[in-house]
Amino acid sequence: MKGSLIIVVFFVLGIIVSLCDVIPSSFPASDVSYYALCCLMFCVGISIGCDTSILKSFRKVNPRLMMLPVMTILGTLAGCAAASLILGHRQLSDCLAIGSGFGYYSLSSIFITQYRGAELGTIALLANIFREILTLLCAPLLAKYFGKLAPISVGGATTMDTTLPIITRYSGESFIIVSIFHGFCVDFSVPFLVTFFCSL
């Protein structure tokens, strides 16, 4: 929750700074976004490569539960496709690109801003932050009424880090490895799916 609020604060500060004309109009904002994206992808690669224990722990995951990330991805994309029918002013590819962030707001919003512009990037940022906050706030209800796997699926890419403690609390410690595996797989899919739908 704290991390999400910090991101929102910096986002709002960026808007205020731009509106106050503090930054010159010649400032290469798109180039900065691109280099920030490259740095972020580099850091993601380092974090995965350094933590070999994550890869080793995946051997303990029940083979049937390995399908959970696939179901999360398909369910999210189906929901986004349905939303595009209601939001007539948005293309199907826009909605699918936003949904493909799966809660990974920092990466997906930069990608979408780079490919589709600041407006859609902002929507992606807020939509994915709301997904994380929804998981944090509703995990008890999700686990109670929809089963122990529900908070994991709703958490999307966040289940290996920010939402892991709350999932562990309400789904149980037996789901820790499943949650990490789920988050890793969904997290890994984000750059590929977002760029794919943005290119349509």
What residue spans do the PLM features occupy?
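Short helix-capping/hinge motifs at transmembrane helix termini and TM-loop junctions
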Residues: D21-V22, L87-H89, R116, G147, ...
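Alpha-helical membrane segments and immediately flanking helix-loop junctions
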Residues: S93-I133, K148-F181
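Helical membrane-embedded segments and adjacent short helical loop/helix-boundary regions
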Residues: M1-T76, L92-G103
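Hydrophobic transmembrane alpha-helices of multi-pass small-molecule transporters
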Residues: C38, T135-L136, T163, P191
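C-terminal ends of transmembrane helices
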Residues: I46-S57, A83-S84, I110, A139-A143, ...
